[in-house]
């Protein structure tokens, strides 16, 4: 057991070249923990608030020096001498110090960086891995990756409305094999796109961002790449979508400019049901807008028995919004983004709330990432069985896959790859 003696913060860059917060926490024993926080492009209106400086003379107003200052003054003063392993008390102290419902005063970026760095320092103090410290002795499930190999929406400069087209190597025997399968398909997709005259530039999350105009185009290319790489769509590899529908929801309608469609909620549900009937799509994230609760109920009634319906902007990793969804029977899965809620303990509460209600949980990165691989450990710690951490390019994405490979290697025969156990059955 060791007390916090010092907290140091700094402004670093994320994968988009924007400033973010990194924090070092030092304990009396000399143990240290470091954490850097991500940021999102398509952010939910109900997320905890990132504090930005607003000084247009630095980083176009996106600087985080105010958040850094809050860490090194108010937060340090509140936590200095606190027991590092009392994570809930530490997180609650920062929440109380902030005094707002969405962490807007101190900044969720400041609070989260400290929260995660404290956990890492505590793990270092005990000389155990972070996944073991957070998850205990039964933390051993390696997650199925949702690999974002075609980017659209807010993550790419192309006409595709849907934000992410992902593959899941459910048929692989191990996590390391799943990463290999994904890499092989990604390489094949690059060849196919290039041969068809499309660019192979990558988007924020490392997937390709070709000038395709429809979901059918993207899914068609992915299907052919899976087959050409020697795998069977729907058996070895399943598909997942992140529609990020809030981004094209206007005045009660879903305006899909790339598709040339304007749909009401029922029309959007029918559109998604048609895609799921024609392709091996087993998971759809944010298929409807964050406050279209009635539409979500229809989507859940239509597809919820056979398709994982993931709430991201809908739930924003917030236990209260999740409980509302559970009570209403809306969605059946929670996307877990630590910076949406802003502390480790609240993140774990959200995962526990989901799992107790029979909802699945998917650990997730953000589009603006760093080399910090904490979410890989958290995916194993929570045994959630699924992770979204981008494509098979960009070191900010592959850092998480590499950490999962290390964890699987360390767990040895105790490791269990989730594989097909994540699939819903009618």
UniProtKB/Swiss-Prot annotation:
Compartments in which it is found: Cytoplasm; Secreted; Cell surface
Active site feature: 205 (proton donor), 337 (proton acceptor)
GO (cellular component) term, any one: phosphopyruvate hydratase complex
Cofactor: Mg(2+)
Keyword Ribosomal protein part of the UniProt annotation: no
Pfam families: Enolase_C, Enolase_N
Residues that, per the record, bind Mg(2+): 242, 285, 312
Catalytic activity, as annotated: (2R)-2-phosphoglycerate = phosphoenolpyruvate + H2O
GO BP annotation list: glycolytic process
Cofactor remark: Binds a second Mg(2+) ion via substrate during catalysis.
GO molecular function terms attached to this record: magnesium ion binding; phosphopyruvate hydratase activity
Enzyme Commission code: 4.2.1.11
Function: Catalyzes the reversible conversion of 2-phosphoglycerate (2-PG) into phosphoenolpyruvate (PEP). It is essential for the degradation of carbohydrates via glycolysis.
NCBIfam families: eno (TIGR01060)
HAMAP family xref list: Enolase
Designated name of the protein: Enolase
Organism for this UniProt entry: Gluconacetobacter diazotrophicus (strain ATCC 49037 / DSM 5601 / CCUG 37298 / CIP 103539 / LMG 7603 / PAl5)
Taxonomic lineage of the native organism: Bacteria, Pseudomonadati, Pseudomonadota, Alphaproteobacteria, Acetobacterales
């Amino acid at each position: 057991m060791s007390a916090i003696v010092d907290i140091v913060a700094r402004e670093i860059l994320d994968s988009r070249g924007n400033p973010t917060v990194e924090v070092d926490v030092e304990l009396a024993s000399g143990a240290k923990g470091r954490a850097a926080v991500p940021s999102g492009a398509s952010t939910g209106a109900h997320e905890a608030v990132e504090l930005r400086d607003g000084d247009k003379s630095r980083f176009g107003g996106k600087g985080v020096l105010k958040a850094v200052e809050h860490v090194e003054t108010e937060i340090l003063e509140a936590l200095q001498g606190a027991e590092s392993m009392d994570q809930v008390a530490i997180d609650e102290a920062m929440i109380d110090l902030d005094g707002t419902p969405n962490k807007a005063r101190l900044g969720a970026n400041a609070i989260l960086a400290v929260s995660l760095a404290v956990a890492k320092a505590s793990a270092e103090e005990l000389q155990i891995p972070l996944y073991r410290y957070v998850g205990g002795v039964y933390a051993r499930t390696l997650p199925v990756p949702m690999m974002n190999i075609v980017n659209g929406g807010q993550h790419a400069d192309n006409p595709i409305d849907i934000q992410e087209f992902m593959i899941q190597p459910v048929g692989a025997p191990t996590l390391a094999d799943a990463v290999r399968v994904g890499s092989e398909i990604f390489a094949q997709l690059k060849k196919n796109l290039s041969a068809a005259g499309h660019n192979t530039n990558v988007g924020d999350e490392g997937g390709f961002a070709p000038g395709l105009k429809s979901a059918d185009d993207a899914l068609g290319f992915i299907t052919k790449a899976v087959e050409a790489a020697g795998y069977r769509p729907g058996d070895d590899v399943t598909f997942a979508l992140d529609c990020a529908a809030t981004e094209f929801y206007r005045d009660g309608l879903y305006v899909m400019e790339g598709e040339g469609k304007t749909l009401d909620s029922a029309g959007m549900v029918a559109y998604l049901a048609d895609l799921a009937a024609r392709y091996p799509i087993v998971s759809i994230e944010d298929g409807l807008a964050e406050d279209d609760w009635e539409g979500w109920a229809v989507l859940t009634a239509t597809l919820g028995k056979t398709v994982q319906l993931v709430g991201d902007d809908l739930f924003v990793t917030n236990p209260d919004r999740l409980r509302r969804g559970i009570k209403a029977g809306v969605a059946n899965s929670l996307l877990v983004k630590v910076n949406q809620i802003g502390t480790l303990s609240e993140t774990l509460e959200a995962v526990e709330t989901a799992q107790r209600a029979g909802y699945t949980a998917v650990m997730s990165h953000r589009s603006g990432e760093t080399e910090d691989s904490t979410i890989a450990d958290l995916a194993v710690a929570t045994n959630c069985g699924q992770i979204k951490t981008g494509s098979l390019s960009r070191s900010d994405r592959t850092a998480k896959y590499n950490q999962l490979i290390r964890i699987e290697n360390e767990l040895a025969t105790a490791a269990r790859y989730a594989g097909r156990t994540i699939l819903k059955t009618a």
